[in-house]
């Protein structure tokens, strides 16, 4: 998808990604996403992640939803805990001036390394080998887009029920290729 065609979303770590706020209910998330022009489907789940909402723009053609939101009702946490943004057709999410979605992975890595050095942040390496700034509430990943590979991102807030951002991300979110 061309950059000019993507929705533009802001990101504040552990608070919100675009119109979605961590802790909001499934119903609130559906209202927010439908107001932004997306069509949503809800799914009830078993375990710590009790709900899933997938959202697509009406013009979406890919197999993966543009945005997938996961909800928790466990220990001291309730509501939106994790969301993923598709690299092929999802909204562009910007963190600290860095565009996270639909990028060439090596270019995003170079920007991350410059950013963590400039801001004196630490960095980690995901299970897939992607570099990311730690303690910022997101982990980048990659997925195929035809013959190319582009970046996508998984955002989470572990407050009240998990130890790390990675602990909040369901296995199926890691498996998107």
Each model region followed by its residue ranges:
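Short helix/turn-capping signatures at newly exposed starts of structured segments
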Residues: 1-177
